[in-house]
Amino acid sequence: MTFDALLLLSFGGPEGPEQVMPFLENVTRGRGIPRERLESVAEHYLHFGGVSPINGINRDLITAIEAELSRRGMQLPVYFGNRNWEPFVEDTVAAMRDNGIRRAAVFSTSAWGGYSGCTQYQEDIARGRNAAGPDAPELVKLRQYFDHPLLVEMFADAIADARDTLPEPLRADARLVFTAHSIPLRAASRCGPDLYERQVGYAAGLVAGAAGYRDYDQVWQSRSGPPQVPWLEPDVGDHLAALAEAGTKAVIVCPIGFVSDHIEVVWDLDSELAEQAAEAGVALARASTPNAQPRFAQLAVDLIDEVIAGRPPQRVPGENPVPGYGSSVNGALCTELCGA
């Protein structure tokens, strides 16, 4: 299989105060979220001038991917499309069509399976192609990459860097806590039994081992919606409170569920959780995400090369008890389980 282009597909985010509410309305469309709740969330963005870091990080990642493609002698233009804000995926796919692109690889900024981590991106692809009409390019979503060696390496290195920011006497006993985005239990049951949770748990174990930790915790963050709807638990804030009560003096939090330092990292962890830790007398260090590292660009191009060359997926050696689904075409589901 060959490709004419690469599409980086992401979530999107506002880039000015006037964009915050329209963006949040796009994100929550059809979910009946009260406006007062949206206004409360909007304050998180307005704290940073109404600008989410995600689009800037993705543009930097595209630059890094272009450099990696050039280094490998692969002449592929890189396009950028989002689900919830400009550049919208529908507009990007139309531009690809107009530029004569016939088949493109799609790299999404989610390493995971499950509805939120994978299926929604398949829906984005299908929606973009439908909007572009019969001459839309074929779009091949690249595989889930939660167990790619470079992802594990980047997070392990980030943990070491975060540990070094703690006061030296606290480093040895600092508790390592992995966190990922919580989802409703109903959503967690789609795409196979507990697929998302199992992938996150497996990846956390790989990263902990690579970072030299045998003991660690894995929790969830950033839940939303009505309190009567059950979501994955424990919450990172509740877990931090329990650690503080048990006498823990230092915590390293690794946001393994995210590939960039977007608003749910810089607000939920760097602001809210950091404030909670300070009040509890716990030293908190947050590991960085891959963002636009050259290694993350290398990972993206590795996935393209796997498809072009028909190579087996690069995975951390050893037995993997957790499924990770491969590439799929034009928004088709990676597994029929996601249609259940």
UniProtKB/Swiss-Prot annotation:
Pathways per UniProt: Porphyrin-containing compound metabolism; protoheme biosynthesis
Alphabetical list of CDD domains matching this protein: Ferrochelatase_C, Ferrochelatase_N
Family: Belongs to the ferrochelatase family.
Name of the top EC class for this enzyme: lyase
Residues given in the record as Fe(2+) binding sites: 181, 264
GO cellular component, one term: cytoplasm
Intracellular or extracellular location(s): Cytoplasm
Record field: transmembrane: none
Classification via SUPFAM superfamilies: Chelatase
EC number: 4.99.1.9
Reactions the enzyme catalyzes: Fe-coproporphyrin III + 2 H(+) = coproporphyrin III + Fe(2+)
Pfam families to which the protein is assigned, alphabetical: Ferrochelatase
Major localization class: cytoplasm
GO biological process, one term: heme biosynthetic process
Primary role: Involved in coproporphyrin-dependent heme b biosynthesis. Catalyzes the insertion of ferrous iron into coproporphyrin III to form Fe-coproporphyrin III.
Signal keyword on record: no
Binding site for Fe-coproporphyrin III: 52, 121
Gene3D superfamilies membership: 3.40.50.1400
Protein name: Coproporphyrin III ferrochelatase
Coiled coil: none
InterPro entries cross-referenced by the UniProt entry: Ferrochelatase, Ferrochelatase_AS, Ferrochelatase_C, Ferrochelatase_N
The entry's keywords: Cytoplasm, Heme biosynthesis, Iron, Lyase, Metal-binding, Porphyrin biosynthesis
One MF annotation (Gene Ontology) recorded for this entry: metal ion binding
Native organism taxonomy: Bacteria, Bacillati, Actinomycetota, Actinomycetes, Mycobacteriales
